[in-house]
Amino acid sequence: GREWAQETKESAVEFVREGGGMVLVHAANNAFRNWDAYNEMIGLGWRAANFGDCIKWEVLRNRPFVTCFDCTSGHGSRHPFQVAVRAPDHPIMKDVPATWMHGKDELYHNMRGPAKNLTILSSAYSSKKQGGTGEHEPITYEVKYGKGRVIITTMGHFWNGQTDWDGLHCVGFQTILARSVEYAATGKVSLAVPPEFPGTDEVSFVEPHAVTWTKKTSNLPVQTTGKKKKEENPHAILTP
């Protein structure tokens, strides 16, 4: 897409820095490679070799580590893969099964960036048989930027001509995305993990129009709700 106007960029940075939240899905981390503040806000993205640090998850020591100094970001073939929670006490991951199967999707590898104030929330093994790296790659992660929160997930691929929606209709992806949005907006998560959530070895699909595990909404008028949210966060961008 087109580069954002400078005014738009500055507004976005101020919004997050002053306490706002932002959620990025899949290829959104490919964007704005030459925008320094954006790279800091997303922590890791699809970048060329030698750009920032390449961060992976070290399973034996249960921690992130820097590796692959000259590798370029990429992905192998689309396939189902098992996601492992790495920050079980984080609001987004609380009560999420330790491991769960995600529907057929692109598994990004060799994500690179400044990686400042970054917490890896989940990872997945990138199989060499599928064109991957043979290492655990970050899947969902958080970056603290100023007073704000940025959540990035590399799940959620869909392309023109694709005949399946597995990556988007996976209940695991839908749950993590919904919880990420709530967390980015409020700093908290009240949306429960649904009973349809995938198991360790089995994928679970629900089309968006059939989702039943939505958050109950307030009966307050829109104006009242908006005013309350604005008081809680004066930097919030609200729509009716």
Task: Describe each PLM feature range.
Residues 23, 49, 103, 191-192:
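Secondary-structure transition/capping residues
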Residues 38-42, 98-104, 111-118, 156, ...:
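Oxidoreductase and adenylate-handling cofactor-binding alpha/beta cores
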Residues 127-240:
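Extracellular ligand-binding/catalytic regions of CAZymes and related secreted enzymes
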Residues 1-3, 22, 28-32, 98-100, ...:
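Solvent-exposed loop/turn segments at secondary-structure junctions
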Residues 2-91:
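A glycine-rich, often tryptophan-bearing local segment used as a flexible ligand/cofactor-contacting loop or short
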Residues 34-36, 96, 163-164:
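A short secondary-structure junction signal
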Residues 44, 58-149, 208-226:
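Catalytic beta-strand/loop cores that center a nucleophilic Ser/Cys/Thr
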Residues 19-23, 121, 151:
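Structural detector of well-ordered beta-strand residues that form the stable sheet scaffold
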